[in-house]
Amino acid sequence: MTLKTKIWLLLGALMGVVLTADLAVSYRKMTGELRSEAEYDAKTVYGFMMATRRIYQKQFVESGLPINESTVGFLPAHSFSRISRDFANWNQNGIVFNTVSDLPRNPGNQADRFELEAMAWFRANPKDTQRMRNIVDDKGVGYLLYTAPVWIEPYCLKCHGAIEDA
């Protein structure tokens, strides 16, 4: 093998190493940026949900409207499950959200296994306000799961206390 061939092979190998390193670094950077963007989006949706929930709930209570079959759908606890289902009609980026419970009155609001695990985690870590982790469902599809507790406050028990009082 001539010196010229050896130099070209060495340069080719060096170029391959540099390109591989650049690809690996770029991939890690892009993955981190995508994760940061997904976390930002999750926090934005959460903030909007909580602000909407608080304003509508307060408005409903202050309005003096009776809570009955005709008006209960206006309360966030009832409307948010419908809003979360309709959200996909307006946004195709894969974000889904819901409000769930480990003891729901409405079976449609039952927490899944990942959400139940998050609830147990928040009970063990009550000072934490959010949690993000990667999960893989039973179909092998991966997601970024953002969870944040909605703690029960005294005014919540007006509707969410004893069934006979609701």
Name what the model sees in each region:
Residues 1-28:
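Extreme N-terminal signal-anchor transmembrane helix of membrane signaling/transducer proteins, especially
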Residues 6, 34-37, 150-152:
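Long, amphipathic alpha-helical coupling/dimerization segments that relay conformational signals between
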Residues 25-50:
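Juxtamembrane membrane-water interface segments immediately C-terminal to a transmembrane helix
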Residues 48-54, 58-153:
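Extracytoplasmic ligand-binding sensor domains of the Cache superfamily
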Residues 150-166:
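The canonical Cys-X-X-Cys-His
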